[in-house]
């Protein structure tokens, strides 16, 4: 999977996600919009934890099932958290971040759209095709992965709306550079990414 040369102490145990937000689903839908400007302000780990849990965290611990629908419950989606201090792989089982690179890869995630590198956090949504049945065709794996990524992306959008964060989902990125740095082969499809940050005027 990903390169794991970073030390164990670089891993981050996230706070418990907050699920008591007073914003209703309908309000989050009403307020959802794509924004390409972000304040120069870090996202605290408690807020990040809530966004990641909403994206594809475990909401039924007894069954190990997640907040986002998943084709044949493959749970193929991986989320990489890309920040100035490095890149981390979200671990839903224990709500933690595993450091996989010490490099700031936000420019690679931004690709040709430089505004994206100004966000304090980018979430890279990847489909691990190894999770799907071997007998599935490549076309089926791609379709399932893209659909699953879409579910997760919408969860990110709604969580950011409820938490007062700006975000925008994008497909543009330097896929080759990211795969090389993260140690991902062709069984991993880098589907999309989302920038998140506080509004610039706050």
Residue ranges and their predicted role:
Residues 1-3:
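Bacterial N-terminal signal peptides
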Residues 17, 126-128, 199:
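Generic beta-structure capping elements
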Residues 21, 88, 130-132, 201:
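Short, acidic Gly/Pro/Ser/Thr-rich loop/turn segments
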Residues 32, 51, 79, 121-132, ...:
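Small-aliphatic-rich amphipathic alpha-helix that forms the alpha element of a beta-alpha
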Residues 83-85, 128-129, 196:
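Short, flexible beta-strand-to-coil junctions
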Residues 183-202:
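A glycine-rich helix N-cap at a beta->alpha junction
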């Amino acid at each position: 999977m990903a390169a794991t040369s970073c030390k164990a102490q670089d891993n981050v145990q996230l706070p418990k996600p907050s699920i008591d937000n007073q914003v209703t689903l309908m309000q989050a839908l009403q307020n959802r919009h794509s924004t390409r400007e972000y304040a120069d302000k870090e996202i605290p780990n408690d807020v990040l934890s809530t966004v990641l849990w909403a994206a594809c965290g475990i909401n039924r611990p007894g069954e190990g099932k997640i907040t986002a629908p998943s084709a044949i419950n493959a749970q193929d989606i991986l989320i990489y958290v890309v920040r100035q201090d490095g890149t981390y792989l979200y671990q839903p089982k224990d709500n933690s971040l595993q450091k996989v690179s010490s490099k700031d890869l936000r420019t690679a995630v931004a690709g040709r759209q430089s505004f994206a590198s100004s966000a304090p956090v980018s979430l890279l949504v990847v489909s691990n095709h190894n999770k799907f049945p071997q007998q599935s065709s490549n076309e089926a794996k791609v379709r399932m992965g893209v659909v699953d990524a879409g579910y997760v992306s919408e969860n990110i959008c709604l969580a950011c709306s409820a938490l007062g964060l700006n975000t925008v989902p994008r497909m543009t990125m330097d896929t080759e550079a990211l795969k090389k740095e993260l140690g991902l082969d062709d069984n991993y499809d880098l589907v999309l990414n989302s920038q998140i940050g506080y509004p610039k005027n706050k």
